[in-house]
Every structure is written in structure tokens, then in C-alpha cells.
Amino acid sequence: MTLADIESFAALSGDHFYAHMDEVAARRNPLFGGRVAHGYFLIAAAAGLFVEPEFGPVLANYGIDALRFVKPVKPGDRIRVRISCKEKSLRAAAGYGEVRWDAEIINQDGAVVASYDVLTIVSERAIPDEVA
């Protein structure tokens, strides 16, 4: 996580909250003590670490539940994601299932910095290469 990453996300999202953009003001915040990454940037960056880009059984993401930003991520920190299947439910009449994934974003020290459930819609059957 670089300062340039944080500033690029601010420019893209329009979120210029002082804790992301103003070092002096961010140091005054007792929760951060300096500039930090946007929580929503962490979620987006984490998706890039676990989402398979090729066509496959996952049809769509449809939500996030129980999102908590537990610990700030600062410029220079590194993140990784731990994800595991938490719950599966079949919607047979619809031809798909719903999968709830337990996700944790973890920093270079092994501390959880964010936790949440990712909700996905997954095909019940393999989808043919050619759809008529």
C-alpha cells in the first residue's frame, strides 16, 4: 500500500477525507496517528487478490455483510487475504446457488485489518462455451 495508491484512490473515488490526504491533520486523529488507506480501497484491493478473472462458476458478487475495519492500514503496509467458504445455499428453481465467504484482510504483521462476508451468486451447473 503506497501513498501514491491512496492518493490515486482518492482521485478516482472523490473521497478526500483528511485522514487519507492530510498528514498533519491525520496525525491529530488518535485512531490513526498519520495518513491511512481508505477502507473501501482495502476491500477493492482485496478483491483483486482473490477474484478469479477467468469465466467460471461465479456469476456475480451481490453484497458484503458484517464489514468491519479493525485496524488502520498505513502507507508502506502490505496486505493479504484469507478467504474461506462459510455457507452455501441452492436456489434450484433459479438455477444458481448463493455462497457466503468469510474474508479477512491481514497486514504484514499478521493482524486482521478488516473482516467481512462476501456474497456471491454461483451457477448450479457448468455453463457451455457457446450459449445459443
Task: Kindly give the residue locations of the regions a language model identified.
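Catalytic strand-loop segment that frames the active site of acyl-thioester-processing enzymes
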Residues: M1-A37, V122-E124
